[in-house]
Amino acid sequence: MPLLLSGKEFRDDLESACCLAIQTPLEGGAETRLLRRLKAAGYRTQITSVRGFGDPEVFLLKLHGIRPPHLGHQNIGRNGALGEVQEVIPQLHELLSEEQPLALWLLEGQVLSRSELLALCDLSEKDPQLKIVVEMGGERKLKWQSMRKFLEQ
């Protein structure tokens, strides 16, 4: 399997498309080999799940507020009926300040809507350092394609 030995074809497709939809075998292993090949090629890698993303651009690049879960009886007079808002630092802002390219590997991408997937494509096209790989479910063999081509199907 030359693909798993070098990962060059995958890396070339990732650099040209900026955002890839990938389908991996359910038993796993293929994605970690590809991540190791990307690291060996000079990429920094980060793996995260897309559940709870909200707006992808804000979640990944901007300071944003979240409301922590309600854990029982609390004083609503202090923070209003909606609760307090906590500021959360962005996931990728500091990683993109370095000159090394960054490969963001997103798990469970099938839960994202079409508009969120297109926003990820736009985000990776705006920033030349950022390359995004979104796992879009399982398949019998490893295959990938540009996210925009995947969404056209």
From Swiss-Prot:
Topological type in the membrane: Peripheral membrane protein
Annotated localization: Cellular thylakoid membrane
Principal location class: membrane
Entry EC no(s): 7.1.1.-
Keyword Thylakoid set for record: yes
GO function term, MF aspect, one: quinone binding
Enzyme class, broadest EC rank: translocase
Pfam families for the chain: NdhN (PF11909)
A GO cellular component annotation in the UniProt record: plasma membrane-derived thylakoid membrane
Family: Belongs to the complex I NdhN subunit family.
Subunit relationships: NDH-1 can be composed of about 15 different subunits; different subcomplexes with different compositions have been identified which probably have different functions.
Function: NDH-1 shuttles electrons from an unknown electron donor, via FMN and iron-sulfur (Fe-S) centers, to quinones in the respiratory and/or the photosynthetic chain. The immediate electron acceptor for the enzyme in this species is believed to be plastoquinone. Couples the redox reaction to proton translocation, and thus conserves the redox energy in a proton gradient. Cyanobacterial NDH-1 also plays a role in inorganic carbon-concentration.
Name this protein carries in UniProt: NAD(P)H-quinone oxidoreductase subunit N
Organism: Prochlorococcus marinus (strain MIT 9211)
Gene label: ndhN
